[in-house]
Amino acid sequence: MRKYEVMYIIRPNIDEESKKAVIERFNNVLTSNGAEITGTKDWGKRRLAYEINDFRDGFYQIVNVQSDAAAVQEFDRLAKISDDIIRHIVVKEEE
C-alpha cells in the first residue's frame, strides 16, 4: 500500500449541502475500493490562479490516503467525468 495525496477543486456555485455530498461521495469511492483515509483538509473557497470552465474561485479539498493503485485510479476516473469537480490531481508521496 502506498501513500497518496489527492487534491480536488469543487465548483464555487454549489450549495453547502451538495458540497458535503460530493466530498462524502468521493471519500466513499476511495474507501469502498480498499483505501484508508489518513487525513482530510478543507481549504475552503480560494481564488484560482487562472479561470477554469468560466470559474474564478473554487472549494479546495485535500485528502491523504493509503491505498493501492486501483482505488486511486477509480477516483481519477470518476473525478474526470464529474461536473462538480473542476480540477483534481493525485500525487504519490515518497516513502
Curated annotation (Swiss-Prot):
Belongs to the bacterial ribosomal protein bS6 family. Pfam families: Ribosomal_S6. Keywords: Ribonucleoprotein, Ribosomal protein, RNA-binding, rRNA-binding. The keyword Repeat does not apply. One of its GO terms (molecular function) is small ribosomal subunit rRNA binding. PANTHER family: MITOCHONDRIAL 28S RIBOSOMAL PROTEIN S6, SMALL RIBOSOMAL SUBUNIT PROTEIN BS6M. NCBIfam families: S6. One of its GO terms (cellular component) is ribosome. Binds together with bS18 to 16S ribosomal RNA. HAMAP family: Ribosomal_bS6 (MF_00360). One of its GO terms (biological process) is translation. Part of the 30S ribosomal subunit. Induction: Strongly expressed during exponential growth, decreases 2-4-fold in stationary phase, part of the rpsF-ssbA-rpsR operon. The operon is induced by DNA damage by mitomycin C. It comes from the Bacteria. It comes from Bacillus subtilis (strain 168). This is Small ribosomal subunit protein bS6. InterPro entries: Ribosomal_bS6 (IPR000529), Ribosomal_bS6_CS (IPR020815), Ribosomal_bS6_sf (IPR035980), Ribosomal_S6_plastid/chlpt (IPR020814), Transl_elong_EF1B/ribsomal_bS6 (IPR014717).
